[in-house]
Amino acid sequence: MRQKVRKALLIIAMLLFPITMWYFSPYLIIQAASEHTVNGSFIVFVSMFILSIFFGRVWCGYLCPAGGIQECVSMCNDKPAKGGWRYKIKYVIWVLWITGIIVTFILSKGDISIDPFYMTDHGISISQIGAYIVYYGVMLLLVIPSMVHGKRATCHYFCWMAPFMVIGSTIGRVLHIPQIHIEAEKDKCISCGRCNKSCPMGLDVKTMVSECKCHSCTECIQCGACIDECPKDALKYKMKWK
């Protein structure tokens, strides 16, 4: 039942993407910074960071429109995306992007203003036919990596939002702040591999269970698919750290 609800939420988020897209825009935050404006995407990114301290990457697993799009694509390519150095690409992108935002803000002039609906039409992102060119371009950028490389490849390799939540969840874990995370009892594991097959991120959950690393995996989106699939209840949600 939990996975049906989760997937329904992702589909709703995906369908609402033409309305919400500018609130996740990595470009508009730079444009707003050049005008000393705190825009909607700035507020969203800061909120993601703060929430991740207590909820990990739950946003990615339950509410992210880009995640919903990629999980639909996984029906065409359900192979796990390769890891290693590729996972670091998004951090390089993030550092360069954040540096650009900061430099742009410092060099800009004028009083600071707050406009959550910056560059939207009464809060709606895509309201004109011409804007759909941008929308479908973004859709292609989200879809192609997952089509070529496998499960949620865009999340793994290129997502500019993921580092906010990785940093936030890491802070929560290091400081032992109560946080939603997945813990495993490896003695219960029978190495059936069902957790690996069910993971929408294509993670090697079985190995993480054997090495007791489920709680510290920064690529885990706390979706709970592995928990629901495990026949021995070896995986569970926890709030308190051991």
Q: Could you describe each region identified by the protein language model?
A:
Residues 1-209, 213, 218-221, 225-242:
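Non-ligating segments of multi-cofactor redox enzymes
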